[in-house]
Design a protein with these regions (language model features):
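Short coil/turn segments that connect the beta-strands within blades of beta-propeller domains
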Residues: 1-2, 52-54, 98-100, 151-153, ...
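Short loop/turn segments immediately following beta-strands, especially the blade-tip
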Residues: 24-30, 69-75, 114-124, 171-180, ...
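Asp-box/WD-like beta-propeller blade repeats and closely related beta-sheet repeat scaffolds
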Residues: 77-149
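Beta-rich catalytic cores
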Residues: 17, 43-45, 89, 142, ...
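Loop/turn-rich, solvent-exposed surfaces of beta-rich toroidal or solenoidal domains
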Residues: 246-311
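A short beta-strand motif characteristic of beta-propeller blades
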Residues: 33-39, 78-84, 127-136, 182-189, ...
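Conserved beta-strand positions in repeat-built beta-propeller and related beta-rich domains
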Residues: 6-9, 14-15, 58-62, 104-108, ...
């Protein structure tokens, strides 16, 4: 790892203390040194890096804006352009395998947007959209993620009902030429369970999804030939003694492909599950404190460590993760930054 890019919320409406998109250089001893804090628009809340590792793209939560940046030799960012896609509250962003288009999920917009990339890395026009219908005309189901399968041929997009729509996850085939998405399957969740995020296993056959209000993690088998999903298992993301909402937030498969982790915002905890190497089924291993408040996001770095962004305690906590036992052990490395909600590494 050379650099870390941290998206931080900035608005009073979000009770935020962040100041923008923060760039850190990761030093040889593992410490993080801030190099830049860039404010373009409010709430740079989620970001991704293109396939050539030359450009970074960021969505601005609660707004309708998406920004592009060139990554300089020293890791700092140069703003290229910001476009208005029209869909409110973009919450996730990713680049296709050909580096041709950018996909954005919008929550209140209920729509996935495909945006063309210009030759200079800036964002071009919206070339395709896919909207999740709601219960009535003019209403939508709120889309919360745009996750690729391992081969970047399909997008998995969780959506929530939030009264006017339907909680669900869809498998969508991506056409690289047109940028269009076409549905191949959908999973309809129980009312109020509210699917949030999913994570694909390295074998491209096992998919794990967390539900925000149901406080569950679900296991699916995925058939890439047909694009079909088969739901096989669900487990709680909190111990049986927890009776209140926990608000499951993020789900990841660890780099070894042996474990699934889920963060819980209201109990400030991390759930860890072991993956059966033959079947893909999960077995609960344990629950660990995240040592902060509201772990909205976490991710693994190339060094195998797990980094948890605690939004409401303004910290990123580094954990050593044991791929043999599944234990999360905090290191002494704590990064202080206002309202962190996304971390992206550049090696």
């Amino acid at each position: 790892m050379k650099y870390a890019y941290v998206g931080c919320r900035t608005t009073k409406q979000r009770n935020a203390r962040g100041e923008g998109l923060v760039v850190y250089e990761i030093m040889p001893d593992g410490s993080w040194k801030e190099k830049q804090c860039l404010f373009t628009e409010d709430n740079p809340s989620f970001q991704c890096i293109d396939q050539e590792k030359k450009y970074l793209y960021s969505v601005h939560g609660d707004l309708t804006l998406v920004s592009s940046y060139a990554i300089q030799e020293d890791g700092t960012l140069k703003h290229l352009n910001t476009i208005d896609i029209g869909g409110k509250n973009p919450v996730d962003i990713t680049v296709d395998k050909d580096n041709r288009n950018v996909i954005v999920a919008t929550l209140q917009g209920g729509t996935l947007y495909t945006i063309a990339r210009n030759a200079d890395g800036s964002l071009g026009e919206v070339i395709a959209t896919f909207t999740y219908e709601g219960k009535e005309e003019g209403k939508v189901s709120t889309v919360h993620q745009c996750l690729w399968d391992q081969k970047k041929n399909y997008i998995f997009a969780c959506a929530q009902g939030r009264i006017n729509g339907y909680g669900q996850m869809r498998a969508l085939k991506y056409d690289a030429t047109s940028g269009r998405l076409s549905e191949t399957d959908r999973f309809m969740a129980r009312t109020w369970d509210e699917p949030r995020h999913a994570a694909m296993h390295p074998n491209n056959r096992w998919l794990y999804m967390c539900e925000e209000k149901g406080d569950k993690v679900l296991y699916f088998q995925f058939d890439e030939a047909s694009g079909k999903l088969n739901a096989l298992q669900e487990l709680s993301t909190v111990p049986e003694t927890v009776t209140a909402y926990s608000d499951a937030s993020e789900v990841m498969v660890d780099p070894s492909g042996q474990w699934v982790l889920v963060s819980n915002r209201y109990t400030d905890s991390m759930a860890v599950y072991h993956i059966d190497p033959l079947t893909g089924y999960l077995k609960t291993t344990g629950f660990f404190p995240c040592l902060g408040k509201t772990p909205r996001f976490f991710t693994f770095a190339s060094n195998g460590k797990c980094y948890v962004a605690n939004e409401d305690s303004d910290t990123i906590i580094e954990f050593d993760f044991d791929p043999v036992t599944g234990q999360l052990v905090p290191s002494l490395n704590i990064i202080h930054t206002g309202s962190p909600v996304c971390i992206t590494f550049l090696d």
